[in-house]
Structure formats: structure tokens, C-alpha cells
């Protein structure tokens, strides 16, 4: 059984492989989905507010960005981050762990430069090749709307594992978080999970093209439901 949640629109779908689902199972899935989305939304909002607050602090000491990043090293460690990074508009990046990076051309970097605050899908870390999730937000000039660069908080890809690992259906249930394009944001670490799934639409399409199309249409229109 797979419960699939979407960020940012936080809709949920259920996929049962095998016997036909009765209403009790559907109701149980819906309740599990609602609880999970509340927990994920709470964590997401708390983390994003924290990153945006850091961006404000950085803007206030922007005349010494290197020293500001040094001060953030202990902050990153305290909150379980892999690193905190600040990127100038040209992509040149300062990091709390000394990683040498240039973020120019990165999708999330470019979105933040346009003023968006974003949680990335699961992506490959340019520093070491491991899977990560990244919160990014713009850093504004303290006295204007000028964007000075992008602040990023980098987490290992198990960022929501404690929430997604909550047991459902005697330990047989597991959860993914996907975005509005169907891309996996947070994968499940359950032993029965589909670890190789990158996009849920593409995955379902391999088995049932009509189901994949229906799923995509429902989610794009703000619907909810299940498929077998």
C-alpha cells in the first residue's frame, strides 16, 4: 500500500496492489494521509521559516558574508543540516563545510533568484554525489527588494523519514512525497518501497497508461482518491 503526498499542494492518493479495497481500508488510508500531511506541512513550514529568518540575519551582516557563514556552521550542526550555503547571483557559493560549489543554472537556485522559497525534490549533491533535499530562499538587501543571492539549507534525503516511517497497516504501509509534476521529493525507506521510482506518473504508466493519465488529471485538478 502506498500513500502518496504532494508538496506544495499536499494531496494524497492510495495505491493498493492485490485485492480490491473496501470502504474501511479507504477510510483508514484517508485518515493516515490526513495525519501525515499535517505533520509534513508543520515540519515544512517550521523549517522554511527558520531558513528565511537566517536569510534576514545574513542580509543584516552582508558586508562580511564569510564570517556570517562561519557563524552558521554551529547552527547547521545543531539542526542536523548537511550544510548551509550562500550563493551569489553568478553561482559562486560559500558553504559552512568548505564544499566548493557553483550553483549557476540549478533549477532551484534560479527560482530563488526570482523570489521563490522552495523545497527541492531529491537531487544529487554536487559536492559528493549523495542524495539530498534543499530548502532555498532569496536573500534580500536589508533596505530594498534587491536580491543579493540565495541561501540554502542542505539536508540528507531522509529529512522527513521520521514522519514517513510512521507505521500503517501493521507496518506494510509506506509514504512518498511528490511534487505537482509527479517527481519524488522524499522517498520512502520502507523495505517494500519502490526505491527506484523517480516520477510516479512514469512509474504507473509502465503498468497502466490509463491509470497514470487519470491520476495526473485528478491531481492537477485538486482531486483525491485511490487506484488499484
Over which residues does each language-model region extend?
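Extreme N-terminal signal-anchor transmembrane helix of membrane signaling/transducer proteins, especially
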Residues: 1-19, 23
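Charged, alpha-helical scaffolding/interaction elements associated with membrane systems
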Residues: 23, 114-115, 221
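Extracytoplasmic/periplasmic sensory segments of membrane signal-transduction proteins
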Residues: 27-36, 42-118, 167
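Solvent-exposed, extracytoplasmic
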Residues: 64-80, 150-196, 200-202
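Extracytoplasmic/periplasmic ligand-binding sensor regions of membrane-associated signaling proteins
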Residues: 78, 84, 89-167, 174, ...
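Allosteric regulatory "coupling" segments in signal-transduction proteins
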Residues: 95-105, 193-204
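Extracellular/periplasmic juxtamembrane segments that couple receptor/chemosensory ectodomains to their
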Residues: 181, 201-228
